[in-house]
Structures are given as structure tokens and as C-alpha cells.
UniProtKB/Swiss-Prot annotation:
Belongs to the complex I subunit 5 family. One of its GO terms (molecular function) is quinone binding. It is a multi-pass membrane protein. The keyword Ribonucleoprotein does not apply. It holds the Pfam family Proton_antipo_N. The chain crosses the membrane at residues 9-29, 40-60, 89-109, 125-145, 147-167, 184-204, 219-239, 258-278, 280-300, 327-347, 354-374, 396-416, 425-445, 538-558, 592-612. This is NAD(P)H-quinone oxidoreductase subunit 5, chloroplastic. NDH shuttles electrons from NAD(P)H:plastoquinone, via FMN and iron-sulfur (Fe-S) centers, to quinones in the photosynthetic chain and possibly in a chloroplast respiratory chain. The immediate electron acceptor for the enzyme in this species is believed to be plastoquinone. Couples the redox reaction to proton translocation, and thus conserves the redox energy in a proton gradient. The gene is ndhF.
Length: 707
């Protein structure tokens, strides 16, 4: 056992040779390295698999003994200051290591096929290896300085991967937005680290917690300053985990390749903020107002993330907002002191969201056979529909991931989300009402994504790329902005949006297949059609389906004879849980079934509403009299229309938050820069030049007067 812990320092460095070797190969043997580029996927996956096996071994030992192991090397700079660096192994480290490596392996296998056509294949795998190294280094860090170093490396890798296709303006702008937004949080994190070092004189976690608790107990610190430092630490987590108000980078980050979206949203970048708060929870929990702040930010993010996807048309952006909402649930749980529930939801959400993003990548990959390489079209849900016929395996996998995120038993997210929802009643009834309501909204918008993508007919064939409408039906927009003439123009809630007809698709060679004939409402023409992805992409999705089905069993919260399956509590013990002081205080069967029935009912209502509004659209057009009967004018209908327009505008405009930042911050900073430039050129330079000119004329005058 001791040997496993002693060699744990190697965990972050195992994947590191790959980017180094790729760089050396491209520098010394560029032609051979590029010709053999597909070879690099295997050692990448192999090295990460070694780390996964090592992490599983550590977790087994943690379950058996709940050990905390720390090894520190000291570097003495002078007699007054020494820098210590090392590694810290506990249950949180082992859980995060397993999460990073398992999801990372599946994403790498998937990426081998997904990125095979891309000229940046080698660069992508080098960035991915460096990303995994940075995350593993972060979770094994023994002090705040190491955390900050790897924190910055994670941010750098995300910048490189989000802007992987940097020639596309959308990707270039997205990586800059992510970088700048995270710099705000990183600056706060650095100030918070320095503040706590000034208070305690230590960066090491165990020494920091012990010294700080003694200072608080003896009332030897200024509470306002401590609260400020803790808030600055939390600001770093807010930015990285896309919490309000620093969440604006996350939807735009979808401009990167889909595999990296899966990794960022499941187990790497957005998980770092949750990890940081979980790691520093012994510090936060003794500061009176910080836990309230964490839970408040969490519940605001939950609500915001559940309302913004309601009118999004890009499939990846809708999933990005769902990630934001689920991260809000985790942050809410940490703010409530429910450490175990937050960690449980982090695990279950990671596998479910990885499955959904890989599924969306499979969808986008198949749609590119129809629309060519055009992200605005290949990711547009309203041009999809009917993909269940063309990609049945992807459809089943995506449906399982969707049901899990909705909280339907016995899938993974049901167990963790239900635990957070149950704990919220013990913390605050207001927060509980918001959390339960957003659970229904989650089910609604997730099934909206599923129905628009897989059910009905392939909507792309209702409009030609030239912009000429092949069917009058395609004049319909979502929420009734514009409609077909046969229907009353005030009817709302159609699940279609018009496409951007000004953008040309770019066909990828060898990626287009032809169908002899497709008949859509009497319209006949030979079309390209979507197709199921290759086995290399389907295999990791099927493995993630198994994780989504069974990973919830590690922490089923029942404490009955013969049903004690709660492995997570053994792994996380001793852990902080302010809501359940007694470690044996779990739900009995009746309480669990009551809460579960209520949560499933709310999710079922959201799914039912989505089916009503987003059922296959063209079949509903067969009964135009019924549709027109719904659209009759009246005071209630006018009021409902106003509510619908309000919801649509709120969601489509991203809650006006990006607009507010653009006006108040971007334009304000640019205006300040222009004012500074004007002041520098006209005033500062004017004074300098004026002094010079004055000296010249005075000298000339003296020269003239003196003869």
C-alpha cells in the first residue's frame, strides 16, 4: 500500500511525453511524423489507461482505509522563506483522477475518428495530453501555489483547444472571451491565495486549515478581511465553473471541436471550480457568510442555466447551458454543506454529459454529409429531425443521456440530483422551490433538444441552399415569429427556425453519400442523407451508456439491511456534511420513495410539456383546423403570446447579460482607452513638446538679445 502512495507523484507526468515527442517529431522529422500521425493515438490512450489503473488502485485503498497521504519537498530560498511542493492523496484526489482518466480515454478514442480528416490532428492530441497532465497535476497538488500553477495551465490548454480552429472568427473570438473572463477569476484567486498566506503563513492545505481554524476559534483575525480573501478564492471557482456572473464564456466555447467540448464539460475545466471549492471547504465552512454566498451563486446559476436554453437552436450551445445549470446544482450542494451530494453529482453528471456531447458530435458528423462543413448548419437542431432513422445507435445513446440528465430512475443523475433536491429543503425552502422547478425545466429543454434532433422528418430538405424555399412550410420560425400563410399568423411555439441562407456549405471530400430518392410531401429529388458514425466513435459512446446506467449504484442513499450500496460514503469518509451531522443519517425507504416520486413527477411534467410543444411538427400540420382553433384571438391568448415572446427574447438574447457586458464593459474600456490615448497624445505629449518649444524660443530670444 505504501508503495502505491509513494509513487503517486508520477500521476500527472505519465501523459506528458506525448506532447513533447510530437513536438520533437514535428521539429526533426516533420514529414514522417505527419504521415504516421494516426499512430500517436495509441500511446496517448495507453499512458492515460496506466494512470486510470493506478487511480483505481488508490481508490480501493481509500475505501478500505480512508487514508490521507501527503509528501512534500522543501526548497529553502532563505532563512525566512521556503517553497514546498509535493502531492496530496485523499478520496477527492482519487475520485477526480478516475473521472479525468476514464472520460479522457473515451474522448481520445472518439477523437481518433472524429479528427481524422483534420490537418491539425497531431496538434489536437498534443493539446489533449497537456490538458490531461494539467488536470491531473491540479487534483494531486498539495498546496495553493501548485494549484494556481496547474490552474493556469488548464486555462491555457482550454484557450488552445477552444480556439483550435483559429482561422474561424467565431472560434478565435470564443477562445479570447474564455481567456479574458477566466483571467478575472484567476486574478481573484491569486489575491485570495496571497491573502490567506499573509494570515496563516502557509500554502499547504493541512497546515492552512489547522492554523486558520485556531485563529478563528481564538478570534485573532479580522472577519471582514477573511471574508474578502475567501470571496476572492471563490471568484476563481466562479470563473472556471461558469457560475453567474462569469458564465458568459461557456456557450461560446462550443466553437471548438466537439470532443474537447465533451472533455471540458465532463471532467476537466468546468470541474476545476467545483474541485477547488470542495478542496477548500474546511476553510470556507468556518467563515460565516461565504457558505451563504456559494449557495446563492449556485442557485442563481441553476435558474439561469435552465432558462437560457429554452430557445437556443445550436445543439452544443443547448448542452452547454445544461452544463452550467448542473454545475449550479453542485455549487448549491457545496454551499449547503452537502459535500457528498456535490461529489456524487459531479461523478454522475460527468459521464452523462460526456455521453451527450459525444452523441452531439456523432450527430454533427453525420449532418456534415448533408450540409458540408458549415457549423451554423450542421449544429442547427431545426435543420435536423428524423435522425432516429439514420443514426439509431446514436439516438439510443443520446436518449439514455437525456433521460439521465432529466433525473429519470434508475439512470445516474437521478440518484445524485434527487439527493441535492432533498437536502435543499433542509437548507432553505425558497432555494428548494427554485431547485425543484428548474429540475422540471431541465427535463423540458433536454427533451426539446432530443425531439428536434431525432423525431419527425429531416427538415433540411424543406429548404434549398440557394435560399429558395422548396416548401412553404419552411417559412415557420420558432415561437411563431414568421409562419406559413395557411395558418393564423399569431400561432406560436413551432420548433423551427430559418437557417442562415447567406452562408455556403463546405463539403468534406469523401464524406457525402447519396440516396437515390427521398419523397417529402410530394417533393422528389436525389439528396445526401445523414449516416451512422463509425465504430470507433460508437464504441466510447456505448461504454458511457453503461456508466450512465450503473454508476449511480456507487452511492444509492438507502440504509436498509441488505441494501447498503453506498460505496461513495466509505470513499469520502470522513467528509464534511453540515446538513447530516450523523454519518448514518440517510433516508429510509419511505422518505426516499416520497422524494423520488415527487422529483420524477416534476421531470415527467417537463417531458410531457416538451412532447406537447415539440412533437414531430409536420404531422401536426395535417390538422390545420385544430391549429387555427388554438390561435384564436382573445385576452388570454394575447397575454400568453406576450409571455412566450418574453421567454423567447430572454433565452435567445442570453438573458441580456452578454449585451450588458458589451455595452458597460467592452465599450466602456474601449472608451477609457481612447480617452487615455487622447490624454497621452494631446496633454502629456503637449506638455513635453511645449516645454521643448518654449526652451527653444527662450534660447533663441536670449541669443538674439545678447547679440
Amino acid at each position: 500500500m505504501e508503495h502505491a502512495y509513494q509513487y503517486s507523484w508520477i500521476i500527472p507526468f505519465v501523459p506528458l511525453p506525448i506532447p513533447i515527442l510530437i513536438g520533437i517529431g514535428l521539429l526533426l522529422f516533420p514529414t514522417a511524423t505527419k504521415n504516421l500521425r494516426r499512430m500517436w493515438a495509441f500511446p496517448n490512450i495507453l499512458l492515460l489507461s496506466i494512470v486510470m489503473i493506478f487511480s483505481i488502485d488508490l481508490s480501493i485503498q481509500q475505501i478500505n482505509g480512508s487514508y490521507i497521504y501527503q509528501y512534500v519537498w522543501s526548497w529553502t530560498i532563505n532563512n525566512d522563506f521556503s517553497f514546498e511542493f509535493g502531492y496530496f492523496i485523499d478520496s477527492l484526489t482519487s475520485i477526480m483522477s478516475i473521472l479525468i482518466t476514464t472520460v479522457g480515454i473515451f474522448v481520445l478514442i472518439y477523437s481518433d475518428n472524429y479528427m481524422s480528416h483534420d490537418q491539425g490532428y497531431l496538434r489536437f492530441f498534443a493539446y489533449m495530453s497537456l490538458f490531461n497532465t494539467s488536470m491531473l497535476g491540479l487534483v494531486t497538488s498539495s498546496n495553493l501555489i501548485q494549484i494556481y500553477i496547474f490552474w493556469e495551465l488548464v486555462g491555457m490548454c482550454s484557450y488552445l483547444l477552444i480556439g483550435f480552429w483559429f482561422t474561424r472568427p467565431a472560434a478565435a473570438n470564443a477562445c479570447q472571451k474564455a481567456f479574458v473572463t477566466n483571467r478575472i477569476g484567476d486574478f481573484g484567486l491569486l489575491l485570495g491565495i496571497l491573502g490567506f498566506y499573509w494570515i496563516t503563513g502557509s500554502f499547504e492545505f493541512q497546515x492552512l486549515f489547522e492554523i486558520f481554524n485556531n485563529l478563528i476559534y481564538n478570534n485573532e483575525v479580522h472577519l471582514l478581511f477573511v471574508t474578502l480573501c475567501a470571496s476572492l478564492l471563490f471568484a476563481g471557482a466562479v470563473a472556471k465553473s461558469a457560475q453567474f456572473p462569469l458564465h458568459v464564456w461557456l456557450p461560446d466555447a462550443m466553437x471548438g471541436p466537439t470532443p474537447i467540448s465533451a472533455l471540458i464539460h465532463a471532467a476537466t475545466m468546468v470541474a476545476t471550480g467545483i474541485f477547488l471549492v470542495a478542496r477548500l471547504l474546511p476553510l470556507f465552512i468556518v467563515i460565516p457568510y461565504i457558505m451563504n454566498l456559494i449557495s446563492l451563486i449556485g442557485i442563481i446559476t441553476v435558474l439561469l442555466g435552465a432558462t437560457l436554453p429554452l430557445a437556443q437552436k445550436x445543439i452544443k450551445r443547448g448542452l452547454a447551458y445544461s452544463t452550467m445549470s448542473q454545475l449550479g446544482y453542485m455549487m448549491l450542494a457545496l454551499g449547503m454543506g452537502s459535500y457528498r451530494a456535490a461529489l456524487f453529482h459531479l461523478i454522475t453528471h460527468a459521464y452523462s454529459k460526456a455521453l451527450l456531447f459525444l452523441g452531439s458530435g456523432s450527430i454533427i458528423h453525420s449532418m456534415e454529409a448533408v450540409v458540408g462543413y458549415s457549423p451554423e448548419k450542421s449544429q442547427n437542431m431545426v435543420l435536423m429531425g428524423g435522425l432516429r432513422k439514420h443514426a439509431p445507435i446514436t439516438q439510443i445513446a443520446f436518449l439514455i443521456g437525456t433521460l439521465s440528465l432529466c433525473g429519470i430512475p434508475p439512470l445516474a443523475c437521478f440518484w445524485s440530483k434527487d439527493e441535492i433536491l432533498s437536502d435543499s429543503w433542509l437548507y432553505s425552502p425558497i432555494f428548494a422551490i427554485i431547485a425543484w422547478s428548474t429540475a422540471g425545466l431541465t427535463a423540458f429543454y433536454m427533451f426539446r433538444i432530443y425531439l428536434l434532433t431525432f423525431e419527425g422528418h429531416l427538415n433540411i430538405y424543406f429548404q434549398k441552399y440557394s435560399g429558395k424555399k422548396s416548401s412553404s412550410f419552411y417559412s415557420i420560425k420558432l415561437w411563431g415569429k414568421e409562419e406559413q400563410k395557411m395558418i393564423n399568423r399569431n400561432f406560436r411555439l413551432f420548433p423551427l427556425l430559418t437557417m442562415n441562407k447567406n452562408e455556403k456549405p463546405y463539403t468534406i471530400g469523401g464524406n457525402v453519400k447519396k440516396r437515390a430518392l427521398i419523397t417529402n410531401f410530394g417533393y422528389k429529388e436525389a439528396f445526401s442523407y445523414p449516416h451512422e458514425s463509425d465504430n470507433t466513435m460508437l464504441f466510447p459512446m456505448l461504454i458511457l451508456v453503461l456508466f450512465t446506467l450503473f454508476v449511480g449504484a456507487i452511492a444509492i442513499p438507502l440504509n436498509q439491511e441488505g441494501m447498503h450500496l453506498d460505496i461513495l460514503s466509505k470513499l469520502x469518509x470522513p467528509s464534511i456534511n453540515x446538513l447530516h451531522k450523523n454519518s448514518n443519517d440517510f433516508e429510509d425507504s419511505y422518505q426516499f420513495l416520497t422524494n423520488a416520486t415527487f422529483s420524477v413527477s416534476i421531470a415527467g411534467f417537463g417531458i410531457f410539456t416538451a412532447f406537447l410543444l415539440y412533437k414531430p411538427f409536420y404531422s401536426s400540420l395535417l390538422n390545420l383546423n385544430l391549429l387555427n382553433s388554438f390561435s384564436k384571438k382573445g385576452p388570454k391568448r394575447i397575454f400568453l403570446d406576450k409571455i412566450i415572446y418574453l421567454i423567447y427574447d430572454w433565452s435567445y438574447x442570453r438573458g441580456y447579460i452578454d449585451t450588458f457586458y458589451s455595452i458597460s464593459l467592452t465599450k466602456g474600456i474601449r472608451g477609457l482607452a481612447e480617452l487615455t490615448h487622447f490624454f497621452d497624445r494631446r496633454v502629456i505629449d503637449g506638455i513635453t513638446n511645449g516645454v521643448g518649444i518654449t526652451s527653444f524660443f527662450v534660447g533663441e530670444g536670449i541669443k538674439y538679445x545678447g547679440g
